[in-house]
Amino acid sequence: MTAEKPGLHPRNRHRSRYDMNALCQSCPQLQAFIVQTPAGEPSVNFADPLAVKALNKALLAHFYGVTQWDIPEGFLCPPVPGRADYVHHLADLLAEDNAGTIPPQATVLDIGTGANLIYPLIGVAEYGWRFTGSETGKDAYASAQAIVNGNEGLTRAIRLRRQKEASDIFNGIIHKNESYDATMCNPPFHDSAETARAGSERKRRNLGQAEDGALNFGGQQHELWCEGGEVAFIEKMIAESKLFARQVKWFTTLVSRGDNLPPLYRALTAVGAVKVVKKEMAQGQKQSRFIAWTFMDDAKRRKSF
């Protein structure tokens, strides 16, 4: 009997334990990182960033057909199952406005797509959506573009735009006469470099990693922290979203802590959001959520742009 990971979305391909043999066939370089658990089952050392990156390569190749994927050293290596959950729950939200059917040609904007390009890769493979990914960092942008260029078919489904103004979110990215069914975002969580380092250190201790061990909790400044932390970033996003109220059906963003929700709800009320939705998610013991808001009523959202 195959054990299931509790809480993951019913359509998530990662509900069952990893079949390491199948993953190694899809990505032979994973084989070098396979270790045995105390129960004698094959696994990887999740405190080893190279092992985690190899596992991600294998997952993306095996489940999503992404054969060319890499990220530069020091960038975030995302947990694929949790990222996939956001995509699937967003699909459910869009289906509610489409007579219960997930729209196959949805257009989605991924804010801060990152060097890993994880949300567009999953969204294109699972639902055939078309993505625009924004990115502020030059190296992250180049990495994401290399992934697009290296995989057949992605150049028609994913386009990237460089956000040249670090203080802007939608400004300069959503062009005049463009429209999107939804936006996505995994915002920076910490409010300073110091708290980001402390958070990485806590995770490292939880895995029993030596103090001088390589971090699997990498990340560039813009990936991990911003002035004012997550709440300030999302409040800025909410304020800017009002400017594009007629061009986007649903604005969405992850919110790492439930404690951060009250000020965000107040900000959404202040800008006149017509409807606000919270989608709860869970990956094992970890609880997460995203909020979605719109300036369109139900009838308008159900019409095509």
UniProtKB/Swiss-Prot annotation:
Transmembrane segments: none annotated. It catalyses: adenosine(1618) in 23S rRNA + S-adenosyl-L-methionine = N(6)-methyladenosine(1618) in 23S rRNA + S-adenosyl-L-homocysteine + H(+). InterPro entries: METTL16/RlmF, rRNA_lsu_MeTfrase_F, SAM-dependent_MTases_sf. Its EC number is 2.1.1.181. Keywords: Cytoplasm, Methyltransferase, rRNA processing, S-adenosyl-L-methionine, Transferase. It is found in: Cytoplasm. It comes from the Bacteria. GO terms for cellular component: cytoplasm. One of its GO terms (molecular function) is 23S rRNA (adenine(1618)-N(6))-methyltransferase activity. One of its GO terms (biological process) is rRNA base methylation. Its main location: cytoplasm. PANTHER family: RNA N6-ADENOSINE-METHYLTRANSFERASE METTL16 (PTHR13393:SF0), SAM-DEPENDENT METHYLTRANSFERASE (PTHR13393). Specifically methylates the adenine in position 1618 of 23S rRNA. HAMAP family: 23SrRNA_methyltr_F (MF_01848). Belongs to the methyltransferase superfamily. METTL16/RlmF family. NCBIfam families: PRK11727.1 (NF008725). This is Ribosomal RNA large subunit methyltransferase F. It comes from Enterobacter sp. (strain 638). The gene is rlmF.
